[in-house]
Amino acid sequence: MTSTLPTRSFNTSRSRQIFARAQQLMPGGVSSPVRAFKSVGGDPVVFDRVAGAYAWDVDGNQYIDYIGSWGPAIVGHAHPEVIEALRRALEKGTSFGAPCVLENELAERVIEAVPSVEMVRFVNSGTEACMAALRLMRAYTGREKVIKFEGCYHGHADMFLVKAGSGVATLGLPDSPGVPKAATSATLTAPYNDLEAVKALFEQYPDSIAGVILEPVVGNAGFIPPQPGFLEGLRELTQKYGALLVFDEVMTGFRISYGGVQAKFGVIPDLTTLGKVIGGGLPVGAYGGRREIMEMVAPAGPMYQAGTLSGNPLAMTAGIHTLDILRRPGTYEYLERITEQLATGLLQIAQETGHEMCGGYLPGMFGFFFTAGPVRNYEEAKRSDLQKFARFHRGMLERGVYLAPSQFEAGFTSLAHTEADVERTLEAAREVLRTL
């Protein structure tokens, strides 16, 4: 492959100026920790605008974006159909605080697509969805203990900040100050892909476990897929012990297939949490599942949960039009093809340039680690060469490729990415890996 990358200066002076001021105004200068580039060094670039597969910073640098707003931008940033629909919705108002027909329309699409969902409740974030799902599994079973997996991230609620992934993993935090022991005393943990560890917990607490929650494909400790039989084994164990199985598909829902991991792998949980894609880039979350479970949620039932902006017309509009684009023929075949081209290309170039690297992909989602692997859980992910990743990230950034600024985050492709974008990315990767 002959490099055709243009020579470009990489001036980020305006970004540095803005970030310096931001640090005086906001903790760490950001509204979410991973954006601060703490694990890769240097100051973050400050975006000015996005469109399609690209982002531009305030200094005018253009990037091929493989973060996609951390997952929502699966049809590409600022898709014209979504933007036009939002313009029309804005003219009717930004929030009603009352029932809205758009809630019905998005709910019908979610229920049609996701096998486990017979009823759905909209909220405002993935964190909120997971908080409600946890409360619901406890309310339905009358039990308190919950099993989660090391490196899986379910938002920043107190009860989930135990061996969590995402920004917690990025910063190397074992948990978080300010979380009382009582909040996590009923949270049990096991290594991801370790069915025997889960069996042992059920044997120890056979009548006390309300359920198991997990990212069925991990994206918040890097990209880690389930081993054959793992999801099926969890389904069998939860049914055996009368516990609920909850798939956190905030990241994977409508991404690796229209029906998420559960549709692609054929393992159906009792409850599912969603977010990101279903809001088309606007703040949103949802949880849903079997009718008999969901009817416990107020006002139909006794389990209380509410939200001022839940089901707001802008998020519903963006979600409806995003899902309608995703339903078109060939969508996921294209995502699989473009993601395979990128992920396999990276591994091949790493091998050719003498670097240990392992990784994988599913449609629209990929990841890699600077280690020989295999990586089947968070402990194995931590074997990655983080200093090498940081240098690789910086080199790619300077060449116009925007990757997640953490080894412990998955990457995302979109319908807007082209084969030419991927080839350009691989050319940049070859240049950088030759220098490491």
Curated annotation (Swiss-Prot):
<comment type="subunit">
    <text>Homodimer.</text>
</comment>
<keyword id="KW-0413">Isomerase</keyword>
<dbReference type="GO" id="GO:0015995">
    <property type="term" value="P:chlorophyll biosynthetic process"/>
</dbReference>
<comment type="similarity">
    <text>Belongs to the class-III pyridoxal-phosphate-dependent aminotransferase family. HemL subfamily.</text>
</comment>
<feature type="modified residue" description="N6-(pyridoxal phosphate)lysine">
    <location>
        <position position="276"/>
    </location>
</feature>
<comment type="pathway">
    <text>Porphyrin-containing compound metabolism; protoporphyrin-IX biosynthesis; 5-aminolevulinate from L-glutamyl-tRNA(Glu): step 2/2.</text>
</comment>
<comment type="pathway">
    <text>Porphyrin-containing compound metabolism; chlorophyll biosynthesis.</text>
</comment>
<dbReference type="InterPro" id="IPR049704">
    <property type="entry name" value="Aminotrans_3_PPA_site"/>
</dbReference>
<dbReference type="InterPro" id="IPR004639">
    <property type="entry name" value="4pyrrol_synth_GluAld_NH2Trfase"/>
</dbReference>
<keyword id="KW-0963">Cytoplasm</keyword>
<dbReference type="Pfam" id="PF00202">
    <property type="entry name" value="Aminotran_3"/>
</dbReference>
<dbReference type="GO" id="GO:0042286">
    <property type="term" value="F:glutamate-1-semialdehyde 2,1-aminomutase activity"/>
</dbReference>
<dbReference type="InterPro" id="IPR015422">
    <property type="entry name" value="PyrdxlP-dep_Trfase_small"/>
</dbReference>
<keyword id="KW-0627">Porphyrin biosynthesis</keyword>
<dbReference type="GO" id="GO:0008483">
    <property type="term" value="F:transaminase activity"/>
</dbReference>
<protein>
    <recommendedName>
        <fullName>Glutamate-1-semialdehyde 2,1-aminomutase</fullName>
        <ecNumber>5.4.3.8</ecNumber>
    </recommendedName>
</protein>
<dbReference type="GO" id="GO:0006782">
    <property type="term" value="P:protoporphyrinogen IX biosynthetic process"/>
</dbReference>
<dbReference type="GO" id="GO:0005737">
    <property type="term" value="C:cytoplasm"/>
</dbReference>
<dbReference type="InterPro" id="IPR015424">
    <property type="entry name" value="PyrdxlP-dep_Trfase"/>
</dbReference>
<dbReference type="InterPro" id="IPR015421">
    <property type="entry name" value="PyrdxlP-dep_Trfase_major"/>
</dbReference>
<keyword id="KW-0663">Pyridoxal phosphate</keyword>
<dbReference type="GO" id="GO:0030170">
    <property type="term" value="F:pyridoxal phosphate binding"/>
</dbReference>
<keyword id="KW-0149">Chlorophyll biosynthesis</keyword>
<dbReference type="InterPro" id="IPR005814">
    <property type="entry name" value="Aminotrans_3"/>
</dbReference>
